[in-house]
Amino acid sequence: MNQISWTKKAIKQLLSIDQRYVKSIREKVNALNTFPDVKLDLKKMSGKDSQYRLRVGDYRVLFEVIDGEPRIINIQTVKRRTSTTY
């Protein structure tokens, strides 16, 4: 079982997110305890040796793996594409 750590930036970003989504993000992040044997929507970041992306609804949780332990480094909001996007 892995120890998950958060950067100060990631904690600040999590606190600024609407509380309706925070529970879902925390549940998915806690599932990283069993990384790499986890069944989540994960994608390895191209060009980065140890960075991954976890998709949680409209949010992307970026994390890196250091000595086998996930470390949350960033939470990004992804806006939906609409006809006005283009």
What function would you assign to each model-found segment?
Residues 1-5, 12, 16, 56-59, ...:
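Enriched for short, Lys/Arg-rich terminal
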Residues 6-7, 38:
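N-terminal alpha-helical segment
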Residues 17, 21-24:
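Hydrophobic/aromatic residues within well-ordered alpha-helical segments
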Residues 25-28, 75:
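Short amphipathic alpha-helical segments
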Residues 30-54:
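A short, surface-exposed loop/turn module that caps and links secondary-structure elements
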